[in-house]
A protein has these predicted regions:
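Catalytic-core regions of core metabolic enzymes
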Residues: 1-695
Length: 695
């Protein structure tokens, strides 16, 4: 953490590549640093200048009289390795490489990037970048920036970690228009060394940061990110915008910074489990953060709306309810506080519609009544522009209550021109405001979700005894791809799962012998792992009623597969189950960055049709297993609805937790499907009917 402190709070800085040419990156970077009011010492290396902007220049790095804490490198990429070595020789331990032209520029740039990565590791010099705009720290005791693209932002409590410098600049510019400040801004660029995990941990412990924003293109250290984000998100909200959430977006990410985007599903699972709030646009990133930074989190979901327009009030109500909030009718006590001071035609139910004639005094009466109502958790102020309203007076009413911070206060000022004078007051006061009801509703909903998230919830994990031979099975078959079905079944049985009765057979005589233990009707399946989609490829024959039909089915199956696979004679016979059961799916997928992802949902032939599934990263806690079961749309049918019998949900939970534990034990598993799993009535169990495992 010491290096990150130097990165953001350097006592002295060395600029290599500062320029006299106005408008150049080297010139603007130095100018912005000076204008920001930086409290430390600035050293400049430029062999062709005596001074720049009143600061003395040195010909070489070794000529600098002291050892600066931080180096800021602005030279062309080709010279960066040489400059980095010279900085290390000087004793500098931390460097920001602003220069572009590395991995994002093609093969030659990638070679240069690998070279500077090697220098960093061998010499112990920490690097932010390359291809970034560096850092901003608005702390009055520091006032430091390496940003060449925009002015120093207003001081605030939001910090921003971004892989894209352009996104940083856009967010800063938008924030300036709203009067919202920042504490720290860090542009990571190509992340050759310092990454978002280290920065997240640092900001998690930073007293001047209340809300953390992140723009992510790729996470290289996925497991560490989850560990850190889980810890930090309990102290302060983390809002993340993940780029590359579509196949086209993933390709754009690859060409933009040389990163390969992970699967959207994986990232969404990671964010959800780590307590990270995912947003879908840079606008949402800012809009939500401004509320988080300025207002207390709601204690409940009850919202009181004050408005001067019926239509927008309805839109706001719909948006709030759609996002999980409640707009309940007000108590008679609250109505009576408002009634004597407003039009007899005003609606006092909720929304409180004061009509177009509302002025600042009427608004204040209504706002005060809702603010004092203990049944209201958040006050939602919504005003449509009206020429007869003194918007500046209204803005002062808003500011007065928003600054109290005893209750969540959300402001929506619709329109632009006619509300601008009021907006200017809110901007100066640092009060967040929204232009439209739906955005404000989503921001408030996320604030409530975070409020619920930080309430203490225990996490308990269940351990199981697993047969050690499972490891031997998997090691022996590692790298073979999908393993044979009989081997899948043996692994699952040794892991404690219940399966439908089954036997393996190698020839007709063996088949007749084994069927006596299973009984009719039965199911015949090809056992070879080479046949991945058994049902589609004719590798499953259902409802076989007698020995004659069984032998005929076996002969047909052998004929079908003898030219396609090696072990075409090996088959599985299972008891054909008919009756009252529901089908679910359980699965695992190993992700290179994050480890095993566990899937649960509606199973059987409906998996691909309805895609009613949910995911968690392994290990899964007992509480998370409960959440998974409740999250799918099919849950009411498992619980019992409209005369349906309740299913064995405890056994489903046992299977989820057992699978999670198995994934921690059997790391060789790359992919697993348990589908279908038949779930019977409560206390009557669940049984795996089919499975596939890839190692």
């Amino acid at each position: 953490m010491k290096e990150l402190s130097v990165l953001l709070n350097p006592k002295s800085v060395l600029l290599i590549g500062a320029s006299r040419k106005e408008g150049s990156v080297g010139y603007v970077t130095l100018k912005n640093m000076i204008l920001s009011g930086y409290k430390g010492t600035i050293y400049i290396v430029n062999p062709n200048a005596e001074s720049i902007l009143g600061n003395k220049c040195y010909k070489k790095i070794e000529d600098v009289p002291d050892i600066p804490e931080l180096a800021v490198i602005l030279v062309p990429s080709l010279y960066v390795p040489e400059v980095l070595k010279a900085c290390s020789d000087k004793g500098i331990k931390v460097a920001i490489i602003i220069s572009a032209g590395f991995k994002e520029a093609g093969p030659e740039g990638e070679k240069l990037e690998k070279e500077i990565e090697k220098i960093s590791k061998e010499r112990g010099i920490r690097i932010l970048g390359p291809n970034c705009i560096g850092v901003i720290n608005t702390d009055p005791e520091v006032r430091f920036t390496t940003n060449f693209a925009s002015d120093m932002p207003k001081e605030g409590e939001i910090s921003f970690i971004s892989q894209s410098g352009a996104i940083c600049v856009a967010i800063l510019d938008f924030a300036k228009s709203r009067g919202i400040g920042f504490s720290k801004v860090i542009s990571m660029g190509n992340k050759v060394d310092i990454d978002e995990v280290e920065l997240l941990e640092y900001l998690g412990n930073d007293d001047k940061t209340k809300v953390i924003l992140m723009y992510i293109e790729e996470l290289k250290n996925g497991r560490k990110f989850i560990e850190v984000a889980k810890r930090v998100s309990k102290k302060k909200p983390i809002l993340a915008l993940k780029a590359g959430m579509s196949p086209e977006g993933a390709r754009a990410v690859s060409s933009h910074t040389g990163s390969l985007a992970g699967e959207p599903l994986v990232y969404r699972t990671v964010f959800k489990q780590a307590g990270v709030i995912e947003v879908s646009s840079p606008l949402e990133l800012f809009e939500y953060a401004s509320l988080f930074a300025s207002q207390p989190y709601p204690k409940g979901n009850s919202v009181g709306i004050v408005t001067n327009a019926g239509g927008p009030g309805i839109v706001a109500t719909d948006a709030l309810i759609e996002n999980g909030l409640k707009v309940n009718e007000l108590s008679e006590e609250t109505k009576n506080k408002i009634k004597p001071f407003v039009s007899p035609h005003a609606s006092l139910k909720n929304p409180v519609d004061l009509l177009a004639e509302a002025d600042a005094e009427k608004f204040e009466v209504a706002v005060k009544a809702l603010y004092e109502d203990k049944n209201i958790d958040a006050v939602y102020f919504l005003m449509a522009p009206q020429r007869m309203i003194d918007i500046e007076k209204v803005a002062r009413v808003i500011s007065n209550y928003a600054k109290r911070k005893e209750k969540t206060f959300v402001t929506v000022l619709m329109g632009v021109v006619d509300v601008e004078k009021g907006v200017n007051i809110l901007r100066e006061e640092g009060i967040p405001f929204y232009r439209f009801p739906d955005v404000a509703a989503r921001a408030l909903a996320h604030s409530l979700k975070y409020s619920n998230f930080i309430k203490e919830r225990k996490e308990t994990y269940r351990n199981f005894e697993l047969d050690q031979s499972i490891k031997e099975y998997l090691k022996k078959n590692k790298g073979k791809g999908f393993i044979d079905l009989d081997l899948c079944f043996e692994i699952l049985e040794r892991a404690g799962f219940e399966l439908l009765p089954w036997k393996r057979a190698f020839n007709e005589e063996d088949l007749i012998k084994k069927i006596k233990k299973i009984g009719f009707p039965c199911v015949l399946k090809i056992a070879s792992g080479e046949v991945v989609h058994k049902m589609d490829e004719g590798g499953v024959i259902l409802d076989i009623k007698d020995e004659k039909e069984l032998l005929n089915s076996y002969r047909k199956m052998k004929e079908r597969f003898k030219k396609k696979i090696k072990n075409y004679e090996k088959v599985i016979i299972q008891k054909m189950v008919k009756g009252d059961f529901k089908e679910i799916i359980l699965g695992l997928k190993k992700d290179e960055r994050f480890g095993h992802i566990l899937l649960f949902g509606l199973g059987g032939i409906f998996v691909e049709v309805f895609k009613d599934v949910t995911f968690r990263l392994s290990p899964v806690s007992v509480e998370e297993a409960d959440d998974m079961i409740r999250e799918i749309k099919f849950y009411p049918f498992l619980k019992g609805v409209r005369g349906e019998k309740e299913r064995d949900i405890e056994k489903i939970k046992d299977f989820i937790l057992r699978l999670s534990f198995l994934s921690q034990f059997a790391t060789e598993i790359k992919e697993m499907d348990l589908n279908p799993v038949f779930v019977f009535e409560k206390r009557k169990g669940a049984f795996i009917a089919d499975a596939r495992i890839r190692v």
